[in-house]
UniProtKB/Swiss-Prot annotation:
InterPro entries recorded: Nucleotide-bd_a/b_plait_sf (IPR012677), Ribosomal_uL23-like (IPR013025), Ribosomal_uL23/eL15/eS24_sf (IPR012678)
Matches recorded under PANTHER family: 60S RIBOSOMAL PROTEIN L23A (PTHR11620)
Gene Ontology biological-process annotations: translation
HAMAP family (UniProt xref): Ribosomal_uL23_B
Name of the protein in question: Large ribosomal subunit protein uL23
Domain of life, per lineage: Bacteria
Encoding gene per record: rplW
Gene Ontology CC terms, in alphabetical order: ribonucleoprotein complex; ribosome
SUPFAM superfamilies linked to this entry: Ribosomal proteins S24e, L23 and L15e (SSF54189)
Species this chain originates from: Neisseria meningitidis serogroup C / serotype 2a (strain ATCC 700532 / DSM 15464 / FAM18)
Length: 106
């Protein structure tokens, strides 16, 4: 399965910053990302390794269904979101702020 680099740069949409993701990052060395809905686990692993230069131990994904919300009298629905919990290999560290700063310089 050949994964082209352009696709890999588009797989990860954004890091998820929340109370839960911060606890996972500190205690389990897991990073949380919002990813494309059709992204596969091997793709996510390759994308994180390519973009951040770290070794990935495992990837767990979950698709969160969008909530139904009202806008006046009309019903609308938020988009479904796919999250990836990426476990880094022992001894690996990922600093998102440093990675973002490096990406801005390029």
């Amino acid at each position: 399965m050949g994964m082209n680099q352009q696709r890999l740069t588009q797989v990860i949409l954004a890091p998820i910053v929340s109370e839960k993701s911060n606890v996972l990052a500190e205690k389990r060395n897991q990073m949380t990302f919002k990813v494309l809905a059709n992204a596969a686990k091997p793709e996510i692993k390759a994308a994180v390794e390519l973009l951040f230069g770290v070794q990935v131990a495992s990837v767990t994904t979950v698709t969160t269904k969008g909530k139904t919300k009202r806008f006046g009298r009309t019903l609308g629905r938020r988009s479904d979101v796919k999250k990836a919990y990426v476990s880094l290999a022992a001894g690996q560290e990922l600093d998102l702020e440093a990675a973002a700063a490096a990406a801005d310089k390029e």
